[in-house]
Amino acid sequence: MLTAEDKKLITQLWEKVAGHQEEFGSEALQRMFLAYPQTKTYFPHFDLHPGSEQVRGHGKKVAAALGNAVKSLDNLSQALSELSNLHAYNLRVDPVNFKLLAQCFQVVLAAHLGKDYSPEMHAAFDKFMSAVAAVLAEKYR
């Protein structure tokens, strides 16, 4: 459960991400592919080389979905319902991968934002990403 303070910190953090969504999203995907090569199996039709147009495009989609979730912190289930359906029923992505990508996204934030990514912000964003992963996995039950 996100507290009022968590929501405030998440919103502040996302303001820092604005303008870097494609960059951060694609870098998070690249990190995931390197650290967890088994995740590449969900992208057989992608050119997975660093900086490829497909990875940049999907990274932008990931970051946009997270941005949409940030705007709907009080109703993540509704905000992510279509995405949950897509990943559960069409793409059949193993839900563990949501947590892997969340971890990689946090590494990207820490690397780019440095001191602006405070321990409090990190903790709040970790709770947020856990909530997002849980919502995306809801349809698997």
UniProtKB/Swiss-Prot annotation:
Pfam families hit by this protein: Globin
One term of GO molecular function: oxygen carrier activity
Keywords carried by this UniProt record: Heme, Iron, Metal-binding, Oxygen transport, Transport
The keyword Iron belongs to this UniProt entry's keyword annotation: yes
CDD domains associated with the record: Hb-alpha-like (cd08927)
Gene3D superfamilies for the chain: Globins
Stretches assigned to the Globin domain: 1-141
GO biological process, one term: hydrogen peroxide catabolic process
Tissue expression pattern: Red blood cells.
Residues annotated to bind heme b: H58, H87
Keyword Cell inner membrane listed: no
Domain of life, source organism: Eukaryota
Annotated GO CC locations: blood microparticle; haptoglobin-hemoglobin complex; hemoglobin complex
Subunit structure: Heterotetramer of two alpha-D chains and two beta chains.
Function: Involved in oxygen transport from the lung to the various peripheral tissues.
Cited PANTHER family: HEMOGLOBIN FAMILY MEMBER, HEMOGLOBIN SUBUNIT ZETA
Family the UniProt entry places it in: Belongs to the globin family.
Listed name of the protein: Hemoglobin subunit alpha-D
Annotated gene: HBAD
